[in-house]
């Protein structure tokens, strides 16, 4: 049965579809986080549309990686940390988890810097922005089920569609775009650096660990696999389409030629994108898109660390458990949450 067949089957109710959809979309929306937006903005500002095609070429790679995590979770009923421990031993599991934690710390610092930058656009001190966000996320996770947290993440992720609006209003020159897409200066070190940066922000360790653990917390089984794969594919396409929109907007508004503008901070990028709209509207739309991706990524990263540490150490871990039933899980979640000092 094909994916479309699975959707059309009389045995597939809307409730079943809703039950299977979610982990793939959430993790892909988290993948369009602050680091991805900055890399895409710099790519468009400096090299125009030359790195645009790469964004769509990465869809199969992104899907294949996340689909493997999905399949492992559904078929084994184990998270990646738990699976590594069972198959390869405690030492390899601890090594993988240590690497993951380092990656997650870096990701959290990136998201917090981006969210602090969004606050600065509107004159809000960084410590207030980060403090409010961390408190809200922790309260949400402690008081909500997996399904509730997932729905909130999906709603926040929808804010990333703002980048599509910016790209559309930047009025890209199609002829110029097609001419630059085929120009690939592969001998230029700066170009290769940005190409590598785009590759690096496409697939990250915490996205793989998250999806495998999320399908378990959501209790997906083999009958859900086809729809869950479709969920992941749609998410991968959405993720790279949003990233491509950022590249297009930066290329259209900043000229996109070698030696072009250098975008090193969130306010700088917001000012550049405001050229596609009015200054005030442009900043609001950009802030909305960036904050949406950063918030989803923050939720995903914190849950990934808590889930994986629980898997490796053998403690129960689920958003379906009350904090008193799973103190280790929520303690890990609190510990990994960034503080306003960050």
Regions of interest found by a model, annotated:
Residues 71, 75, 93-124, 130-134, ...:
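Hydrophobic transmembrane alpha-helices that form the core helical bundles
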Residues 34, 38-40, 209-238, 257-268:
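Hydrophobic, small-residue-rich membrane helices and short re-entrant helix-turn-helix hairpins
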Residues 1-35, 91, 194, 220-226, ...:
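Membrane-interface "cap" regions at the ends of multi-pass membrane proteins
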Residues 157-183, 192-212:
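Hydrophobic alpha-helical segments and their helix-loop junctions in multi-pass secondary transporters
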Residues 335-342:
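Conserved small/polar residues in nucleotide/adenosyl-binding loops
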Residues 63-75, 237-268:
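Extracellular/periplasmic helix-exit of transmembrane alpha-helices
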Residues 27, 54-87, 95-106:
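Juxtamembrane transmembrane-helix boundary signature
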Residues 10-14, 48, 75-102, 121-126, ...:
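Transmembrane-helix boundary/entry motifs in multi-pass membrane transporters
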